[in-house]
Amino acid sequence: MGDSVSSSSRVSVHQSLGAGSVADLLLWRNRTGAVILLISSTGFWFLFERAGYNLLSFVSNVLLLLVAIFFLWAKSATVLNRPLPPVPNMEIPEEFANKAADDLRVWINYVLSIASDITIARNPIRLLQVSLVLWAISYVGTLINSLTLVYIGVLLSLSFPIVYEKYQDHIDEKVNSTSKFVRNISRKFPLPINKEKKHQ
């Protein structure tokens, strides 16, 4: 009985990841895409981190190669009366730029609201949360560089969702018990009460 209740209230990992192509990729339902992502990210990490290749020189060499190939293709096409190379329209649509600007504005406003919550409202819990996150980022930054951190993020994003989907009940049970434990501990700390005078 308890199993049927927990399975009926269980949220699908595929649905929570958006139920689209990204969810299929992260849950290895699109095995080809997941393998390509894993191999390409490993190749880039090895190329830039272990082989010591520079990102700027890599990008400039790739662009130089593409420009040379398209130039030679276009010149040979005019000489041999062949069609020109199919170069896509290299232009950012206005709708895409507006949507990106709106999304960026939402994130900036969220960060500013957190800063306002810390400074103006003097929320000590939010200050502690932000301080811990910033300290953790700083500490991790001293241990590894950003490219390795991105590579670890790719590896975790390809492994954690599938593990969570397989062992969702056990993980949820442990997270709930940990959350209850943390809540019980945090209740023992007194919170300052804001006493504001009301002006009428």
Curated annotation (Swiss-Prot):
PROSITE patterns cross-referenced by the UniProt entry: RETICULON
Protein keywords: Endoplasmic reticulum, Membrane, Transmembrane, Transmembrane helix
GO cellular component: endoplasmic reticulum membrane
Membrane topology: Multi-pass membrane protein
BP GO terms, sorted: response to bacterium
TM annotation in the entry: 33-53, 54-74, 143-163
Domain Reticulon: 22-200
Record protein name field: Reticulon-like protein B11
